[in-house]
Design a protein with these regions (language model features):
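Short acidic-glycine-tyrosine-enriched beta hairpin
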Residues: 46-62
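Short, conserved beta-strand element in jelly-roll/cupin
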Residues: 17, 26-42
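Structural motif
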Residues: 32, 39, 64, 72-74
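Conserved short histidine dyad/triad with adjacent acidic residue
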Residues: 9-28, 60-61
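Double-stranded beta-helix
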Residues: 6-13, 70-98
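Short histidine-centered beta-strand/loop micro-motifs
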Residues: 6, 22-28, 44, 68-69, ...
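Short beta-strand His + acidic residue motifs that chelate non-heme Fe in jelly-roll/DSBH
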Residues: 42-43, 59, 65-70
Length: 98
């Protein structure tokens, strides 16, 4: 579902992945990420969690979420309804290999 200025009334479901990358954003809606494969770290509100295949991580509406995968993570994301408020992309970073 492409973004529309008026928002959306139903949850939106999509797949995404990180490969030795970090992504930080802020959404006006709740965001749930189900880890399909790999290892994902999520930091929001001063709390960091580590998630593996089968785990779900929730970032509340309005909160900044930072997501990173030291090697690889494949995710299924669910965005809650949105009344048309914009999301903010706060940063992307390629992680260095050690």
């Amino acid at each position: 579902m492409p973004p529309v200025p008026s928002g959306w009334s139903e949850p939106v479901l999509f797949e995404w992945e990180l490969t030795a990358e970090s992504w930080t954003d802020q959404h006006p809606h709740c965001e749930y990420n189900f880890v399909i494969q790999g290892q994902l770290f999520v930091e929001s509100g001063g709390i960091t969690v580590e998630a593996h295949a089968g785990d779900v991580v929730r970032v509340p509406a309005g909160a900044v979420g930072r997501y990173w995968a030291p090697t690889y993570a494949r995710l299924l994301a669910v965005y809650g309804p949105n009344t048309g408020e914009p999301s903010r992309s706060l940063g992307y970073q390629k992680l260095s290999k050690r």
